[in-house]
Regions:
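Residue-level detector of high-confidence beta-strand sites
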Residues: 15-18, 148-150
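Helical "lid/coupling" subdomains associated with nucleotide-phosphate turnover
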Residues: 6-9, 24, 28-57, 69-118, ...
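A short acidic Gly-Thr/Ser loop motif
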Residues: 1, 122-128, 202-206
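A structural signal for short, well-ordered beta-strand segments
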Residues: 19-23
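N-terminal basic/disordered segments at the start of proteins
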Residues: 1-14
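Cationic, histidine-enriched alpha-helical/coil surfaces that engage anionic ligands
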Residues: 61
């Protein structure tokens, strides 16, 4: 993603709205512990494109943030050297805690004032999945993070590790659920998810599933940004696309071609987070999130 903004005492003004390119940098890292050559090629192509944009919009400073998928790769230095050569800035690999804070800040920035807190931000990333609880449940969502946990269960790796058939078998799905639930239960020891009143999803998986639940025939960021979705609708669309063959998923323009191979694992991960948080909320205050 690239975004160019002017920051002043009056706030933030977007000069170049968000540009998104799906590169799947974490492709096969779980298996090989290295960035795949095709993933690096996609990353460098996006970086060169961004460099051209920055030539048209000279900036005072650039921050290139990379997440945990970068830290896991043995050829990380090669990636960082090439990005620095293209953009003139070295990627900054941030810890999961900072990734969680930034995700929560971005997620709560689009929440309506009438939406009840505390808020649980869920970021299904390429290298990890963050759970961040915050907001005081009274005023407009603030940026106060109460608890956060980074789970080493990225959506793409659930597909690569468990959902190997197309479509996946029921046994593979149950194996993936057991793996995901174990990580979520561990996260809940740090994050009191039962206090959650509103779940805010962040990531291409979440926005894609939401767009499909809304019945959009093509992906529209402006329509999805800040949209709400019931758990019932989320479960239905998650299960549908988890069990859908790849060739059929390709017919949906709502799904970016770069996500077609991994959207099933992402859908299952999102499904389990929603279910486990709803169960925790019911146990905590006798009311499920709907």
């Amino acid at each position: 993603r690239l975004k160019v903004s002017r920051v002043s005492e009056d706030g933030v003004e977007d000069i170049v709205p968000r540009i998104l390119r799906v590169i799947r940098l974490g492709q096969d890292v779980d298996k090989t512990h290295r960035f795949a050559e095709e993933a690096l090629d996609r990353a460098y192509a996006a970086a060169r494109e961004f460099a051209e944009v920055l030539k048209e919009h000279p900036v005072d400073g650039i921050r290139f943030v990379a997440t945990s998928a970068t830290g896991d790769a043995e050829n990380r230095e090669e990636f960082e050297d090439n990005i620095e050569q293209i953009l003139g800035v070295r990627p900054e690999v941030i810890p999961g805690t900072e990734e969680a804070d930034l995700s929560f800040l971005g997620a709560t920035s689009v929440v309506r004032r009438d939406v009840e807190g505390p808020y649980l931000g869920v970021d299904l990333g390429g290298g990890s999945t963050e759970l961040v609880l915050g907001g005081d449940g009274v005023s407009h969502p603030n940026t106060q993070v109460q608890a956060a946990f980074s789970m080493n269960i990225p959506a793409a790796r659930r597909t690569e590790r468990h959902l190997k058939n197309d479509p996946p078998t029921e046994a593979q799905i149950q194996e993936a659920i057991a793996d995901i639930d174990e990580h979520i239960d561990e996260a809940f020891k740090t994050v009191p998810a039962g206090k959650t009143r509103t779940i805010i999803g962040v990531s291409g998986t979440v926005t894609t599933m939401t767009a499909l639940a809304m019945g959009l025939t093509e992906y529209d960021h402006s329509a999805v940004d800040g949209a709400s979705c019931s758990l019932e609708d989320a479960y239905a669309v998650d299960n549908k696309f988890l069990k859908m063959p790849r060739e059929e998923r390709l017919t949906y323009k709502t799904i970016h071609p770069g996500r077609v191979d991994v959207v099933g694992g992402g859908a299952l991960l999102w499904n389990r987070v929603l279910a486990k948080v709803s169960e925790a909320a019911y146990a905590d205050h006798g009311q499920r999130i709907d």
